[in-house]
Amino acid sequence: MSASTTDTLRHDWTLAEVRALFVQPFNDLLFQAQTVHRAHFDANRVQVSTLLSIKTGACPEDCKYCPQSGHYNTGLEKEKLLEVQKVLEEAARAKAIGSTRFCMGAAWKHPSAKDMPYVLEMVKGVKAMGMETCMTLGRLDQEQTEALATAGLDYYNHNLDTSPEFYGSIITTRTYSERLQTLAYVRDAGMKICSGGILGMGESLDDRAGLLIQLANLPEHPESVPINMLVKVAGTPLENAEDVDPFDFIRMLAVARILMPQSHVRLSAGREAMNEQMQALAFFAGANSIFYGDKLLTTANPQADKDMLLFSRLGIKPEAGEGHADEVHQAAIEQALVEQQSSSMFYDAASA
């Protein structure tokens, strides 16, 4: 791909084409990805988001990677849906330390009718603060999707996790077609899609390519594409899975950037295991979004002040959100992050 073709958005990628991207020399792949990235984004800006678990544990799904599944004994305590006021307090705290998007995740197969009114109030409250809103609640029906859109939800996260061919080896309680149907409902309701997957579950190169093909060949590319590295949790079937080669993970980010030029490619779960050099390579490969705070959904996430120190060393600045002048936004982050204290409510995006 030449620089002259970086504006092309495609929805017809083939396995042969994507496999060829994966296997080309590493430097060539990163050069191509960086060229595409610079055609669509400021290469020195990264979106920062905070993720809060609003309902933790006892999920009826059997996703083999997930510590929140009720099928496995991981020691995670079940928690009820958080009160709306507590969620809004955490959102205000996230905004104060620089997050421009607040994501709320619940360990559900799908939201119940009795929980929806509370969820809708959370969306309205966070929107009123001037933040972007994102939720991951499991499978949605059309009525629920339209209600969330009416409440003002900006983004809905629903990961495809892996390729259709490998999916049945990881999850049996929800079909791939159900996941695609939820994404269709979200798209039709006018919300933006956040969807990605996980590396390190025993998948092949073709499975990694197949996941990205599914995402890139959707009618519209996801606005955000979280790429997770498996966080191995004791008690889950994948606790002894083989580690992902760091260069293979960077290749995944780079190919995602090439296939979906205008999407935010999110460096998500597993970042705690990445050293600074690997994270810097990830940004060079086209990753331009991170979750930060103390934790994602159930696993450790690098401390936010460390993130900002790394940003400073790399000359990277957070994307400014609505209502934040760049200077004010940056100052708020740097001031508050040094004083940020641990919060047990921040939890791994891979389980979304």
UniProtKB/Swiss-Prot annotation:
Keywords: 2Fe-2S, 4Fe-4S, Biotin biosynthesis, Iron, Iron-sulfur, Metal-binding, S-adenosyl-L-methionine, Transferase. Binds 1 [4Fe-4S] cluster. The cluster is coordinated with 3 cysteines and an exchangeable S-adenosyl-L-methionine. It comes from the Bacteria. It comes from Pseudomonas savastanoi pv. phaseolicola (strain 1448A / Race 6) (Pseudomonas syringae pv. phaseolicola (strain 1448A / Race 6)). It is an enzyme of class 2 (transferase). The lineage of its organism: Bacteria, Pseudomonadati, Pseudomonadota, Gammaproteobacteria, Pseudomonadales. PROSITE patterns: RADICAL_SAM. Catalyzes the conversion of dethiobiotin (DTB) to biotin by the insertion of a sulfur atom into dethiobiotin via a radical-based mechanism. This is Biotin synthase.
